[in-house]
Amino acid sequence: MRKSSTSSVSTYSEPVILEYFLQQFHSRGGTVLYNSRDMQPGDQSEPEEDGPEPFDSETHLRILDVQERRPFGHEVHCLSEPSMHLVRARVNDRGDLSNGSRIEANSDVLGPLSEIRHRDLSASANGELTEAIIGVISEDSERHLGFYNRANNLSLKMHAFQLLPGIGKAKALQMVQIREIVGWSKFEEVDEVCGINSVRLLAERYVKEMEDATQSTRLLDLLVRSEMRTGVEPWMTWTLVS
């Protein structure tokens, strides 16, 4: 016999439902980040120690844009150093902040940093980005020059130099032949013998990787960020296919 649709339905509080879910989840071998006690309202247990913040290793910020923040105040779009993350922050004290200025990452004039996607940058910030990256490369030239001195074949048909804008297979082969074993000690040497603007080409490649996170070979990770994550010198973990 079919039950009446008006029959009463038992209701359960959220803690009971959560406890049941956790029991079922664990019975199937699952693991969760929090147990039911952690999720109870009003829990007075001691919080776990916070891990390192994502931008703890950053020392400076290059201001790409200062813009009004609704309903009031300002925020900045920045490029961090040395890892070259795109970040934003609330402005506590505008002072002399302007496009192109460089400040310490832990400066009190800014609030906490948060990452921003390239597509969410303001038009002004996007226009400043390449020059800001060139500035970062120039400040830490040895790290970035390593690309020109150690780049190898990515595959049987493609050399890493071909990741740079405008560099084709013939030009890449020419650069490899010029480099030989000794390599270069400064960017100016690369420019003179190869007829390129080595810093700008590298900066433009970095911008492309920021625009498109799906790039399979990311020089930003290989050259810049791997050391920040692992403490290993750049290039020691970059093994390209020859």
PLM ranges: what are they?
Residues 3, 31, 140-163, 177-242:
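C-terminal extensions
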Residues 168-169:
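Small-residue hinge/turn detector
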Residues 172-175:
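Conserved hydrophobic/aromatic packing and binding residues within compact polymer-binding modules
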Residues 1-139, 233-242:
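Structure-specific DNA junction-binding interface
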